[in-house]
Amino acid sequence: MLDTILQTKREEIERLALPEQVEVKKVSLYDALRKPNRSLGLLAEVKKASPSKGLIRADFHPVEIGKSYEAAGADAISVLTDETYFQGHRDYLTKVKQAVNIPVLRKDFIIDRAQILESVRIGADAILLIVSTIPTTRLKELYDEAHELGLECLVEVHSEEEIAELFSAFTPTLIGVNNRNLKTFETDVAQTEKMAQVIPHGTMFLSESGLYTYDDLQRVKRAGATGVLVGESLMRASSPEEGIQHLFGGEPVATDA
């Protein structure tokens, strides 16, 4: 499936037309996750569909969802912009970014500099880079180019082999451990526990995918995760607020003394 997605992405890049620059205030994803509103940082995802689950939320209003996430204490928002496989759109990200004050990450299969330029123009604060999609040397180039253009990066790994390959090239500021195998699309939260053993102590990392319950969050917290990226369980909830409350076991948002 991943190979098919990447081939589609390469074809899209060939005909990519860059939009006009959107003027928005940049907000740091790194800073938001370093000082989360709850015991774990929450990167809440705006996600209509996926290849593995099909349509996740038919009643889909990205701006309303994004504003609800912010009101419920999410630290940042991830917006799917892939159209073909996730029914996302880059305009969703722009509209969400214009409506909230917390960081917004572009979640897509970013493999080319043109997509980084596009991400800047649509107003993203950060982008996702996936180790399994491109050679590590190229990923490092994209990482550096993104930072030069004012974008932060969440660098995603799944296996011990990928993380060894990544760290042999460079150490990102923020890592995402995907509990989903992108080749089989199967998920296992134990992947975060396993990967935590090989991530250097003190490195910020998120657990991604397959997180549905308070117990799931406690597992990855014990493993050392800085935060979580959650989409499906929040999108399937009766409301984003209810979904976040359920996920965090009713834990309130921290208030400054």
UniProtKB/Swiss-Prot annotation:
UniProt KW keywords: Amino-acid biosynthesis, Aromatic amino acid biosynthesis, Decarboxylase, Lyase, Tryptophan biosynthesis
Reactions catalysed according to its record: 1-(2-carboxyphenylamino)-1-deoxy-D-ribulose 5-phosphate + H(+) = (1S,2R)-1-C-(indol-3-yl)glycerol 3-phosphate + CO2 + H2O
Signal peptide: none
Enzyme Commission code(s) on record: 4.1.1.48
NCBIfam families, alphabetized: PRK00278.2-2 (NF001375), PRK00278.2-4 (NF001377)
Family (UniProt): Belongs to the TrpC family.
Protein name stated in the entry: Indole-3-glycerol phosphate synthase
Organism from which the protein derives: Halalkalibacterium halodurans (strain ATCC BAA-125 / DSM 18197 / FERM 7344 / JCM 9153 / C-125)
Source lineage: Bacteria, Bacillati, Bacillota, Bacilli, Bacillales
Gene name in the database record: trpC
